[in-house]
C-alpha cells in the first residue's frame, strides 16, 4: 500500500513535465511539417516554372497550395492542439482581422515573399516559421511572448 502511494505521488509530480514535453515535441514537429510544405511550394514554382499560390487560413489551421497547372492542389492541416497565432508580415495599417485568410504568390525565378507564420501550442510555446526572401529557404525560430 505504501509503495502504491509513493508511485501515485511520483506520477502526479512527473505528469506535468511529461505533458509539457510532448506538447513541445508536437509543436516542433508541426513547425517542421510547415517548413517542408512551404519548401515544396517554392520548389514547385522553381522546378516547374509556374506561379504558385499559398493560402493560409488561421481559423481552420490549414495551408493550401494551388498552381497554374491543371488539377494541382496540396493541403496541409495543423493538429488540433497547434494554432496559427499570426501571419506575417502584418497587413498595412494593422487594422485587419488577424484571423482572415491570407494569400501569397510565389513566382518562378522571382523573389520569394517574406512569409511568416507564428505557431503556438497549448503550453504557450511558439515557433515562427519564416521564409527568407533572399535564399527562399524556410527556417524556424523559437519564440516566447508577443509578435515582433
Which residues does each predicted region cover?
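N-terminal helix-rich module
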Residues: 9, 13-36, 43, 47, ...
